Amino acid sequence: LSSGEKDLVVIGSGPGGYVAAIKAAQLGMLTVCIEKYPTFGGTCLNVGCIPSK
């Protein structure tokens, strides 16, 4: 993660986080999204609700 000023920092890339980060970037904001997993989507999409069905 490079240092410097950002307009928006989104913590977590669940269903709300990644949409917020994408929309902010589309609106011209310098945006960074912090996620502990290697893929976006959060726990439900990657290891919880959807994969368990």
From Swiss-Prot:
GO terms for molecular function: dihydrolipoyl dehydrogenase (NADH) activity; flavin adenine dinucleotide binding. Binds 1 FAD per subunit. Lipoamide reduction and the NADH -> NAD reaction are both completely inhibited by copper and cadmium ions. It is found in: Mitochondrion. Optimum pH is 7.5 for NADH -> NAD transhydrogenation, 6.5 for lipoamide reduction, 4.5 for NADPH -> NAD transhydrogenation, and 6.5 for NADH-ferricyanide reduction. It is an enzyme of class 1 (oxidoreductase). InterPro entries: Class-I_Pyr_Nuc-Dis_Oxidored, FAD/NAD-bd_sf, FAD/NAD-binding_dom, Pyr_OxRdtase_I_AS. GO terms for biological process: 2-oxoglutarate metabolic process. Its EC number is 1.8.1.4. FAD binds at residues 35-44, 53. Its cofactor is FAD. Disulfide bonds join 44-49. The keyword Flavoprotein applies. GO terms for cellular component: mitochondrion; oxoglutarate dehydrogenase complex. It catalyses: N(6)-[(R)-dihydrolipoyl]-L-lysyl-[protein] + NAD(+) = N(6)-[(R)-lipoyl]-L-lysyl-[protein] + NADH + H(+). Keywords: Disulfide bond, FAD, Flavoprotein, Mitochondrion, NAD, Oxidoreductase, Redox-active center. Lipoamide dehydrogenase is a component of the glycine cleavage system as well as of the alpha-ketoacid dehydrogenase complexes. This enzyme has lipoamide dehydrogenase activity and NADH -> NAD transhydrogenation activity. Also displays some NADH-ferricyanide reductase and NADPH -> NAD transydrogenation activities. PANTHER family: DIHYDROLIPOYL DEHYDROGENASE, MITOCHONDRIAL, DISULFIDE OXIDOREDUCTASE. Homodimer. Belongs to the class-I pyridine nucleotide-disulfide oxidoreductase family. The active site is a redox-active disulfide bond. This is Dihydrolipoyl dehydrogenase. It comes from Hymenolepis diminuta (Rat tapeworm).
